[in-house]
């Protein structure tokens, strides 16, 4: 949602200020398949295993989301 950096529904998220929905100082991310302990996972970390003829998807080191490989079946 606009103006929100993270999901502020739970005060238990150690990366997010539940009152403002903003990431805490030093946090890169609050959740996502490529977010680990408030930091982006390193480039090349598998975030989605291949299925069928598809290939594995990897974190890019710059976001918390898991980008689809360009050869997605």
UniProtKB/Swiss-Prot annotation:
GO terms for molecular function: toxin activity. One of its GO terms (cellular component) is extracellular region. The keyword Secreted applies. InterPro entries: Disintegrin_CS, Disintegrin_dom, Disintegrin_dom_sf. PROSITE patterns: DISINTEGRIN_1, DISINTEGRIN_2. It is found in: Secreted. A motif (Cell attachment site) lies at residues 51-53. Disulfide bonds join 6-21, 8-16, 15-38, 29-35, 34-59, 47-66. Belongs to the venom metalloproteinase (M12B) family. P-II subfamily. P-IIa sub-subfamily. Monomer (disintegrin). The disintegrin belongs to the medium disintegrin subfamily. Inhibits fibrinogen interaction with platelets. Acts by binding to the alpha-IIb/beta-3 receptor (ITGA2B/ITGB3) on the platelet surface and inhibits aggregation induced by ADP, thrombin, platelet-activating factor and collagen. This is Disintegrin trigramin-beta-2. It comes from Craspedocephalus gramineus.
């Amino acid at each position: 949602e606009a103006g929100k950096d993270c999901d502020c529904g739970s005060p238990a998220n150690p990366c997010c200020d539940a009152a403002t929905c903003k990431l805490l100082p030093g946090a890169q991310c609050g959740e996502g398949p490529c977010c680990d302990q408030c930091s982006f996972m390193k480039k090349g970390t598998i975030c989605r295993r291949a299925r069928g003829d598809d290939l594995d998807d990897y974190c890019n080191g710059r976001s918390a989301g898991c980008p689809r490989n360009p050869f997605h079946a």
